[in-house]
């Protein structure tokens, strides 16, 4: 988000936010933690989507809020970029069998059709308005000062909707894709084709110029947009004319040793935006293509080392880490927003690129080391040398093992600094790793889900990278006019007959995300925790109790909440405790009792209490 200033953390009406900072944990049992954290992250995303999300009250249906945080910083808005990335994650989960997400995806597309038509400071539907970066959660224009326009949003939104549209066609619902999805997608593609070559603000909302990330995702959107248009019986000539020019321009960001993140801004150009560009244009059918900076390409791997190395010496929490060990990763080394810290999503992006590369090497059956990528490989495997190594060779196996361990190291850093409840804010501090900036950042949770899936070799559908090979002999920053039209989606036809659909046998989940909400008036420095008879609640040990958060606390509604993943059907007893300066006060007897739901399709629950 925009880093206008670094601010003091807010106090919630007498309750210190800092008082409920998580205790840092050692990174153990990564597989087990990821299984639990993935479930938590899925629910945390749903909590941040209107109108029914627990943390998105007041947001219109389908609107994805960036964070529930309303002060220091205020992220209670919907960003087109964040929403597109988050929804693409949910669409991928849906295509993988998570049928419960269908109505959320439909509501998202309906909401975006409405938002596209809102006149705003960047313009109207057909005059640049799609480049407006953020809106109020009630689908009204945000008219305050901001870094606008931002041109990555329409491309990312188009990619998310195209993926769902392709699923519709593949499952016999072509008319829905044609009548409801394509018109909304076409607006975004028209914007990308018209404005891709013009300057705008980067994804961090700070640098005005042209950005690698924006150009990369624009290229992808135009390529898959053209294919999707043909699938629904239409065409996208403006996609076809501009995609080769965008691909040509993309090459200009390569410096010879790393990817220049932005043209403009006066910084070194070493920026995780380049790694994000690589992972969000990853095509599981692609080779290690330098032209599109595929994750396993020599360029992308060389860039990964340069970018991640730029954070090794500037964060105290990275002290003592060897060259072959993962580090906490921020946005760019010159960052000063909230004093310039590592972010959860950027650290996870560093891991995800490596998991993508591992998938690509396995699919190709070999890996190649060039002069460009040699520094990356030598840092992890000291005897690395240029050449191509088949998957049957010892060198290949040793390198793959080293890269896998290196990738896991980034996720273990996230595991260490995530809250014991699973919560992830935007950032964790460079000095001690305590969480800071906006709480429960939706993008953080989406990044966890995508990194975890790639680690498990669960990959998205291809987007056509292998067919997008044309590069003009001379680049030209051209543009093309498309077709804009106002779209109103009043309702969605019933979609049935697919795995997990309402008419299919329903599955009882193995775990349920239970949110405990207790009203307890507190004073400055006092916190509320939950402790109980099961290990997830500390086995009645106050020192192992789970801290609740006071982010929704007001004088009229002194609410403390926390979400914990628990086994379905588990019965247990619990109590709330007050903790201040190490002193523990238990609430009065009797013990509270609760049984986790074990019901078809129920993956979350809320238990509301009042302190006694």
Swiss-Prot record:
It is an enzyme of class 3 (hydrolase). Substrate binds at residue 146. Glycans are attached at residue 39. Pfam families: CBM_20, Glyco_hydro_15. InterPro entries: 6-hairpin_glycosidase_sf, 6hp_glycosidase-like_sf, Carb-bd-like_fold, CBM20, CBM20_glucoamylase, GH15-like, Glucoamylase, Glucoamylase_active_site. Keywords: Carbohydrate metabolism, Disulfide bond, Glycoprotein, Glycosidase, Hydrolase, Polysaccharide degradation, Signal. The active site is at residues 202, 205. Residues 1-19 form the signal peptide. The keyword Repeat does not apply. Disulfide bonds join 236-239, 248-475, 288-296. Its EC number is 3.2.1.3. Gene3D superfamilies: 1.50.10.10, Immunoglobulins. One of its GO terms (cellular component) is fungal-type vacuole. SUPFAM superfamilies: Six-hairpin glycosidases, Starch-binding domain-like. One of its GO terms (molecular function) is glucan 1,4-alpha-glucosidase activity. GO terms for biological process: polysaccharide catabolic process. Residues 506-612 form the CBM20 domain. It catalyses: Hydrolysis of terminal (1->4)-linked alpha-D-glucose residues successively from non-reducing ends of the chains with release of beta-D-glucose. Residues 20-25 form a propeptide. Belongs to the glycosyl hydrolase 15 family. This is Glucoamylase.
């Amino acid at each position: 988000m925009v880093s206008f200033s670094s601010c003091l953390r807010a106090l919630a009406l007498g309750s210190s936010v800092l008082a409920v900072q998580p205790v840092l944990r050692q990174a153990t049992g990564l597989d087990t933690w990821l299984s639990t954290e993935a479930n938590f992250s899925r629910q945390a995303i749903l909590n941040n989507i209107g109108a029914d999300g627990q943390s998105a009250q007041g947001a219109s249906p389908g609107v994805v809020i960036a964070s529930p945080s309303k002060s220091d910083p205020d992220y209670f808005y919907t960003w087109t970029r964040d929403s597109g990335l988050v929804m693409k994650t949910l669409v991928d989960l849906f295509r993988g069998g998570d049928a419960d997400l269908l109505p959320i995806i439909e509501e998202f597309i309906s909401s975006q059709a409405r938002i596209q038509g809102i006149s705003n400071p960047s313009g109207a539907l057909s005059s640049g308005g799609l480049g407006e970066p953020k809106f109020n959660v009630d689908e009204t224009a945000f008219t305050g000062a901001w870094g606008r326009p931002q041109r990555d949003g329409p491309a990312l939104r188009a990619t998310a909707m195209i993926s769902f549209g392709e699923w519709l066609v593949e499952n016999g619902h072509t008319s829905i894709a044609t009548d409801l999805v394509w018109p909304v997608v076409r607006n975004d593609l028209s914007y990308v084709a018209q404005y891709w070559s013009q300057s705008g603000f980067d994804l961090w909302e700070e640098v005005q110029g042209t950005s690698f990330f924006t150009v990369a995702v624009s290229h992808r959107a135009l390529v898959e947009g053209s294919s999707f248009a043909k699938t629904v019986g239409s065409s996208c000539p403006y996609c076809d004319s501009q995609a080769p020019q965008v691909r040509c321009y993309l090459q200009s960001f390569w410096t010879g040793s790393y990817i220049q993140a932005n043209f403009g801004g006066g910084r070194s150009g070493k920026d995780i935006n380049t790694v994000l560009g690589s992972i969000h244009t990853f095509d599981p059918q692609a080779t290690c293509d330098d032209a599109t900076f595929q994750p396993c390409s020599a360029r992308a791997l060389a860039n990964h080392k340069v970018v991640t190395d730029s954070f090794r010496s500037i964060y105290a929490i990275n002290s003592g880490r060897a060259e072959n060990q993962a580090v906490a990763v921020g946005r760019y080394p010159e960052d000063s927003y909230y004093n310039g810290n590592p972010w959860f999503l950027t650290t996870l992006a560093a891991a995800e690129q490596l998991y993508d590369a591992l998938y690509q090497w396995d699919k190709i059956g070999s890996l190649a080391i060039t002069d460009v990528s040699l520094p990356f490989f030598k840092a992890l495997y000291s005897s690395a040398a240029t050449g191509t190594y088949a998957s049957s060779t010892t060198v290949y196996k040793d390198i793959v093992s080293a890269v896998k361990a290196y990738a896991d190291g980034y996720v273990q850093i996230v595991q260490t600094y995530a809250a014991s409840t699973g919560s992830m804010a935007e950032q964790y501090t460079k000095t001690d790793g305590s969480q800071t900036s906006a709480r429960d950042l939706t993008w953080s949770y989406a990044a966890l889900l995508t990194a975890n899936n790639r680690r498990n070799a669960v990959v998205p559908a291809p987007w056509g990278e292998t067919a997008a090979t044309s590069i003009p002999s001379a680049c030209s920053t051209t543009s093309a006019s498309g077709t804009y039209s106002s779209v109103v989606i009043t309702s969605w036809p019933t979609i049935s007959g697919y795995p997990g659909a309402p008419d299919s046998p329903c599955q009882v989940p193995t775990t349920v995300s239970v949110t405990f909400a207790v009203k307890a008036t507190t004073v400055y420095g006092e916190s509320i925790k939950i402790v109980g008879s099961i290990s997830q609640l500390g086995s009645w040990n106050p020192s192992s109790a789970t801290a609740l958060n006071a982010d929704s606390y007001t004088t009229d509604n002194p609410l403390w909440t926390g979400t914990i993943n628990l086994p379905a059907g588990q019965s247990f007893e619990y109590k709330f405790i007050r903790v201040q300066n190490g002193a523990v006060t238990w609430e009065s007897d009797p013990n509270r009792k609760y049984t986790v739901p074990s019901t078809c399709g129920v993956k979350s629950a809320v238990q509301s209490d009042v302190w006694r």
